[in-house]
Amino acid sequence: MKKESLDFCYDGMFKDKRIDNRATRLLSDITNSGTVTINRCCPTHKERIGAYRMLNNPQCCESALSEALFRSCHDNILSRHVLCIQDTTEFNYNAHIDRIGKDDKGIGPITKDSHAGFFCHPMLVVDPLSHLPLGISALKLWNRDWDKKNRHERGYQHTPMEEKESYRWIECPAKSLFQLPEDTIQTIIADREGDIYQALCIIPNDRTHLLIRSSSNRKLEGEDCLLLERMSSLPIQAEYEIEIRGHDSRKSRTAKIALRFSGLSLARPHTCPSTFRDALSINCIYVVELPQTVPQGEEPIEWRLLTTHSVDTVEQAMECVNWYRCRWFIEELFRVLKSQGLDMETAQLESGSALKKLLLIALPAALRIMAVKLGYDSKNENIQAGLYFSESEQRCMRLLHKTVEGKTIKLKNPYRTYSLPWAAWLIARLGGWAGYESAAKPGYITIKRGMDTFLCKYDMFKMMENEFEQIDKKAPT
């Protein structure tokens, strides 16, 4: 991926040029303020009124805002292969239901039936080499009806696939391919919820590969064993170590992983219509943590990855494993949109439609925060800061380094000037990170706080820069 910048705007997306300008301005306000709350992100009363009116204007439609996302993603792709990561999240507005009202057609029950909100299923496009986000190539927003019947009442097993919510796992890859450059191949990555036999049959084509984590211990065609038994019986092809970050139910550690892989044939489940093929040939990569590094009381790290990519060598298998590890990025995107970033669930609008449109405008801002964090983590100095920051912003960064660098080498920015890790180091320091390489890596809250601080300082820098330009123009020659 090599491009001068990943700029985003809404030029030409709406019939009314004023909506183009207003949407671009609101995105800028969200990016600069680090929040989607209109009363906090818009600097003046006039801007706030304009934002509310736009979000409630039927001419500012979800389809045009989505198309702007897809157009930007298309323009950012310069490689022949991209990773397309899909997953689902929900936005909970139960705290605001009195303002919105249960009769609003844009809001409905979410996972917890008594809570109100809507669902979002995006396709995040990631460059397979730099591991940086390029944009969103497909997206589905929807809400359930309050009077929707349960699975038993609806006869879920007999409902056509196209009418099920799970059809999103098939629908979005097709829409994603349509939005990509014609010579670009996509690898669809999904967690266990995407392990649907119909999807495994329908999605692959000349430009679409699959890399799905298996959820079912499936039956195999022509064999007396199930998938897990078959993969466990194979000889270990390689062993390697990975660093595991701890959380509530998992300890931090260096895990030793065993790698196995094989081609196999999945048998059609009895719940799948007979119109689908009886057996499906696919490759499986099985990675499991060896017993010696599994802490007592914990389950081992274990992935069974189903893929249409060729897996004949350890190198090919490891490449697929590393691609699948990028699936975590979409979880991080959801966190940036919510409590660790833009606080989308605190937005105080009066309709589900307006909230969905606000989410579509907030996505590019979330991607920028995410890219800065990943830019620091990658430490890849070949990635230019100019991908995500303007020349003026980079000049401001150069000046701000004097305020955050220490006197010792350990507190100097170690990265090449104007590289993305160089910019991310500054942002992290402005967010309160200690700056030492031995310190814990800055997280999203630190990066988001640093972006807020930087953009506040940049506003002053830009104002002074413009003022000096005016003085220079007026100065006698």
Predicted segment positions?
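Single, function-defining residue in the core of a domain
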Residues: 1-104, 112-119, 124-477
